[in-house]
Amino acid sequence: MHPQGRAASPQLLLGLFLVLLLLLQLSAPSSASENPKVKQKALIRQREVVDLYNGMCLQGPAGVPGRDGSPGANGIPGTPGIPGRDGFKGEKGECLRESFEESWTPNYKQCSWSSLNYGIDLGKIAECTFTKMRSNSALRVLFSGSLRLKCRNACCQRWYFTFNGAECSGPLPIEAIIYLDQGSPELNSTINIHRTSSVEGLCEGIGAGLVDVAIWVGTCSDYPKGDASTGWNSVSRIIIEELPK
């Protein structure tokens, strides 16, 4: 193999072109200067040689590598794929029940009297007004005070609560009774015992808002009344408390 030669320089090519041009002129007939057609033909050949030389492209040295271009714009989204297969059936879960209870704020009230000394046998003894906050709650009521009943013959008295003028119906009235039977007229009928007692219970079904809670005294069914006394010589009180159901 022969070693590769160097590329021809521009000066060498120019020299070769001039020599070629000179040869063309020398090869032209001497009568060319006298014959216009021949002269014109020679000029055309010279121009062809010049055009051929001008059309030659010389390969220069390699240029500096260019910089990376800017990233292209995002392409068009592809079409949706084929739906996958159904997964395996999961295990049976457990049912959890959670109860969210509203926080409860205590709501209660007490009305008290130092000495009622109420000697009526029928009617309202005392009253206490209470503000009930919820409709789905219950009221716990308590009356505490001295009670007394006396009579010559068998008698019965009943102490009970009312709510806005009506006895409790959820579920039943709240009451307490005292029954007294001397047994015979010969026995002492002047027994006069005052004893601290209580009337207490829960009542449901009362709407929210103001509730007038009262303690009353009345008769028992099928029995005559006696001589009743409430709150003698001692403190009496009504306590009302709202409770969640």
From Swiss-Prot:
Q: What is known about the tissue distribution of this protein?
A: Expressed after injury in the carotid arteries (at protein level). Expressed in brain, lung, and after injury in fibroblasts of the adventitia and the neointima of the arteries.
User: Domain named Collagen-like: which ranges?
Assistant: 59-92
Major localization listed first in the record, in broad terms? secreted
What do we know about what induces or represses this protein's expression? Strongly induced in carotid arteries after injury (balloon catheter injury model). By various growth factor (BMP4, TGFB1) in NIH 3T3 cell line.
* Gene Ontology biological process terms from the UniProt entry: cell migration; cochlea morphogenesis; cyclooxygenase pathway; establishment of planar polarity involved in neural tube closure; inner ear receptor cell stereocilium organization; negative regulation of canonical Wnt signaling pathway; ossification involved in bone remodeling; osteoblast differentiation
Region named Disordered: 64-87
GO cellular component: a single term:
collagen trimer
User: Where is the signal peptide, in residue numbers?
Assistant: 1-32
Which molecular function term from Gene Ontology is one that the record holds?
Answer: prostaglandin-endoperoxide synthase activity
Q: How is it modified after translation?
A: N-glycosylated.
Sorted UniProt keywords = Collagen, Extracellular matrix, Glycoprotein, Secreted, Signal
Subcellular locations according to the entry: Secreted, Extracellular space, Extracellular matrix
Q: Which residues are glycosylated?
A: N188
Protein's job: Its overexpression in smooth muscle cell lines increases their migratory ability and inhibits collagen type I expression. May act as a negative regulator of collagen matrix deposition.
According to UniProt, the name of this protein is Collagen triple helix repeat-containing protein 1
Q: Which organism is it from?
A: Rattus norvegicus (Rat)
**In the UniProt record, what gene is named as encoding this protein?**
Cthrc1
